[in-house]
Amino acid sequence: MSENKYAELIIDGKSYKLPVVEGTEGEKALDISGLRKNTGYITVDPGFFNTGACYSNVTFIDGERGILRYRGIPVEELADKATFVETAYLLLHGKLPSKEQLQAFSSLLNLNSMLHEDMRHFFDGFPRGAHPMHILSTMINALSTFYPNVDLQSLKEDINLSAARLISQVRTLAAFAYKKSIGEPIVYPRHDLSYCANFLNMMFDSPVKPYEMNTDVVKALNLLLILHADHEQNCSTTTVRTVGSAQVNLYATISAGVSALSGPLH
């Protein structure tokens, strides 16, 4: 909040002070959190084009100036020196992992990459040609029945475990959905492969033609995931925050965000 800076709002001849808030990149906003309490008025802002819903130190993006930073680090630097797994850890914890922390987080991703075997049969219920994003949203929601206790308290106690389950299993779900769409048998995750290599292998390996790992393709996927790791307060993020505010199970919350992401106007 800018020190001693206020905007003056006059309603029916009465003056009200609205604190001026300044972001790290110099953006300015008016704090109207006390508006209704102090004046009895609310604001009308269709589409929330003029509203910042929260304070955040996770991501800064300015498309016009070509700026994207995660936790203050330019995405170009992360793309050059970090992996997607390191970037995910950065977004979760506010700093890049040490060697030991990276090993521990990577191990969690591997240990939680498998789906419950009963979930394989769920894919048989989708019609041929079903939208892959709709399948993904449904299957993520189904995870909430296998992990019913992933709530606010469990997230506070072990954010790494909850995040690892989600980050790892979404990759497995996406690969299974793709294999189902082309009529090929599913490919299970492998602990000896990196995050991106594992995803590619699940997508393109075949019983009749083993997938030959291409390091350039692995690198390209890694860069793609880094660039899309977080994009500030967009529609899907807002959806996740809104649904999650009711203390909904983590997987059901993320499922809602995926549904928002599937929309053509996202």
Which role fits each region the language model picked out?
Residues 2-265:
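Hydrophobic alpha-helical bundle cores within soluble ligand-binding/oligomerization subdomains
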